[in-house]
Design a protein with these regions (language model features):
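Exposed, low-structure sequence patches enriched in small/polar residues
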Residues: 1-345
Length: 345
């Protein structure tokens, strides 16, 4: 319950597994069907993919966060994982987005929409040849990131279904793999891309994940601001080089501490076509006035980091620099320290 907005938030899910499970629902291979219902705030442009958004460490932020809507979701998910590491996930998602003071739904004619519905139908195909897991009593952990991972996702939401005012039709694909550099460590590499084929509201477009916390979050940008970039086509990359002591091992006292170097380079290059630009498509909702939106004009957003891993066997500390779109940004959005718990085996 929120004491300031005076709204209840809740979530519930029910899953049936076609395979017998010994300890937990994510045991490989998964073959299940799940129905879920959720009502909560939607932190627009800040979707943490591998961390619970209610994590206490995410509550400390470098700037005030007001870009939120209320979102109600009713989902049906079917997941099938095969022994050859090919998986299919099909989903039907009835979603209602409710406007707030900071994220209103207003078109260029001044027409205000308090809320709108979309019914998303999506299919995700994933193939990771050679992928293996270490299964504990509560979770499964991938143990060989050398395996390449290919993911293809397509999402379609027809106009008019359950009152949906717009069509959404978009495709995304990604590739990730670990590359070994012999005695010089290894590189974890990921590249992603996507395109929106339809004329759709901005919340259904392709928005990079901004990370306002002081923690290191995968597949997000540590110094980007929420809704700073909104695109209907993009390509992004994320490279982390783990040097395995290639530099620090030459310093005798430091070598005994077994500290390890970590360097990262990530970026996002996107574009927004006229059909999804609310200034040129009058019936689309305008971007929020409170959002720091900036068109890309062919120049990618980029940031780099350098850090030390294996502090106390479990801590990584990075210093991050923003390379592009620095003009007009506060100091906290140009560079800063970030930390993460990182345990290796």
């Amino acid at each position: 319950y929120g004491t300031k907005d005076r709204k209840w938030k809740y979530g519930a899910e029910l899953e049936y597994s076609f395979n017998r499970k010994r300890d937990h629902q994510r045991e490989f291979p998964v073959h299940s069907i799940m129905v879920s219902e959720k009502y909560d705030v939607d932190q627009v442009g800040q979707h943490y993919l591998f961390t619970n958004p209610d994590n206490v460490f995410l509550s400390l932020k470098r700037m005030e966060n007001v870009l939120m809507t209320y979102r109600r979701q009713t989902r049906l998910d079917y997941t099938l994982e095969l022994a050859n590491n090919f998986s299919v996930k099909a989903s039907a998602n009835l979603e209602r987005q409710e406007a707030t003071t900071w994220v209103p739904f207003v078109n260029s004619s001044g027409v205000v929409t308090p809320h709108y519905n979309e019914t998303y139908l999506s299919v995700e195909l994933r193939y990771a040849p050679g992928e293996k897991f270490f299964q504990t009593k509560t979770q499964r952990i991938p143990v060989n990131l050398d395996a390449p991972v290919f993911v293809l996702t397509h999402t379609y939401a027809p106009k008019g279904l359950f009152g949906a005012p717009f069509t959404v039709n978009k495709t995304e694909a990604s590739f990730s793999k670990r590359f070994w550099l012999s005695a010089f460590g290894f590189v974890d590499f990921m590249v992603k891309g996507g395109h929106v084929w339809s004329r759709s509201p901005y919340l259904s477009l392709l928005i990079p994940n901004a990370n306002l916390s002081y923690t290191i979050q995968p597949e997000s940008f540590a110094l980007m601001n929420p809704l700073e970039f909104i695109n209907d086509s993009y390509v992004s990359w994320d490279m982390t080089y783990w040097a395995n002591g290639a530099i620090l091992n030459y310093i005798p006292l430091v070598k005994k501490l077994k500290l390890r170097e970590a360097f990262a380079f990530r970026g996002w290059l996107g574009a927004l076509s006229d059909k999804n630009n609310p200034l040129k498509s009058p019936d689309l909702y305008l971007f929020p006035v409170s959002a720091p939106y900036e068109p890309m004009h062919g120049k990618p957003y980029m940031e780099i980091s350098a850090g030390i891993d294996n502090f106390f066997k479990c801590l990584r500390v990075d210093y991050v620099w923003r390379l592009t779109y620095r003009e007009g940004q506060p100091a906290s959005s140009r560079s800063g320290l970030r930390i993460a718990l990182h345990v290796t085996f």
